[in-house]
Amino acid sequence: MTNIRKQHPLAKMINHSFIDLPAPSNISSWWNFGSLLGLCLMIQIITGLFLAMHYTSDTSTAFSSVTHICRDVNYGWTIRYLHANGASMFFICLFMHIGRGLYYGSFTFLETWNIGVILLFTVMATAFMGYVLPWGQMSFWGATVITNLLSAIPYMGTGLVEWIWGGFSVDKATLTRFFAFHFILPFIIAALAMIHLLFLHETGSNNPSGISSDSDKIPFHPYYTIKDLLGAILLLLCLFSLVLFSPDLLGDPDNYTPANPLNTPPHIKPEWYFLFAYAILRSIPNKLGGVLALVFSILILTLIPFLHTAKQRSMMFRPLSQCLYWMLVADLLTLTWIGGQPVENPFITIGQTASIIYFLIILILMPLTNLLENKLLKW
């Protein structure tokens, strides 16, 4: 009797992607984050679906509907905090996944990398719109400040902002459309993730050494399914620890105050995972310049494959590049810290310095270090 796993059209597709997939034998735990992102997306879609059953996207009832979910719905508080902290876990995995791609040279798979950058933008847009939905103070003012940035676009900016708002300020129309987009985007993310995987399976996975692993492959199942399962258990352990012991650790206390257009919070700031980009935005005094720097801070990822001048793909055997890489990580952590601080000295100066260092490392120092390491190879 023929094996249904290898014969049935649908089972065959799953088999080729997750069971009999030839995988390099030496990939480390840094390769776990792809599957963890899939798990995070599933958690977000399921918890989001249950939240949408009780949420009302109306300015007069949105805040109280979230309160109702937490107080009156059976295990509503768990679902709400799983969704909120699940987003934080999503971004932790996302940053680790991108960091691994940069360190081990996975960006040379151009299609996979570029779809990944599109995915990052989509996830960021989804998270931003989700933050607006509880209709607390930080939700309202965050939405006002961030959407207002589009008014910096010459000629069409003001009209574009009013078009997004659906009026002359962030109001009922804005909340309703943000809810609609926030609901549909995760499914678009899931579709993009499938395309991401499709392109990855065209080339096969990279590995820590950065050299071809065609001569030494092992089946994905059981080796990497077990490994991914361990990662999933650890992720769920962290997520549930956060949800059950300290659910508001990563949130903003201002969001427990209903949105009030007449009262501006002293420090408007987004969620922690946007703070690095927010710090870059704030470090430029000019509005249009700030917006361009903000967009380019993410878009710069698409340039990395073209700035890669090294003979070796991975940083595993390139100590100078490793030093620069960890400087970049430290710089991003500094930017994240600065993004949460008030706009006053010395924070302004630190933010501007860290922003310059960020672009300097990626655009100039990395390619130069790569060329220097190429020279050192000949010694």
UniProtKB/Swiss-Prot annotation:
Miscellaneous: Heme 1 (or BL or b562) is low-potential and absorbs at about 562 nm, and heme 2 (or BH or b566) is high-potential and absorbs at about 566 nm.
Classification lineage: Eukaryota, Metazoa, Chordata, Craniata, Vertebrata
A GO MF label: metal ion binding
GO cellular component: mitochondrial inner membrane; respiratory chain complex III
Binding site for heme b b566: 97, 196
CDD domains, A to Z: cytochrome_b_C (cd00290), Cytochrome_b_N (cd00284)
PROSITE patterns documented for this protein: CYTB_CTER, CYTB_NTER
Protein name: Cytochrome b
Residues at which heme b b562 binds: 83, 182
Keyword Membrane (UniProt): yes
SUPFAM superfamilies from the UniProt entry: a domain/subunit of cytochrome bc1 complex (Ubiquinol-cytochrome c reductase), Transmembrane di-heme cytochromes
UniProt-listed Pfam families: Cytochrom_B_C (PF00032), Cytochrome_B (PF00033)
Chief site of localization: mitochondrion
Matches recorded under PANTHER family: CYTOCHROME B (PTHR19271:SF16)
Coiled coil: none
Positions of a ubiquinone binding: 201
Annotated family: Belongs to the cytochrome b family.
Subunit (UniProt): The cytochrome bc1 complex contains 11 subunits: 3 respiratory subunits (MT-CYB, CYC1 and UQCRFS1), 2 core proteins (UQCRC1 and UQCRC2) and 6 low-molecular weight proteins (UQCRH/QCR6, UQCRB/QCR7, UQCRQ/QCR8, UQCR10/QCR9, UQCR11/QCR10 and a cleavage product of UQCRFS1). This cytochrome bc1 complex then forms a dimer.
Alphabetical UniProt keywords: Electron transport, Heme, Iron, Membrane, Metal-binding, Mitochondrion, Mitochondrion inner membrane, Respiratory chain, Transmembrane, Transmembrane helix, Transport, Ubiquinone
Entry's localization field: Mitochondrion inner membrane
Function statement: Component of the ubiquinol-cytochrome c reductase complex (complex III or cytochrome b-c1 complex) that is part of the mitochondrial respiratory chain. The b-c1 complex mediates electron transfer from ubiquinol to cytochrome c. Contributes to the generation of a proton gradient across the mitochondrial membrane that is then used for ATP synthesis.
One GO process term, biological-process aspect: mitochondrial electron transport, ubiquinol to cytochrome c
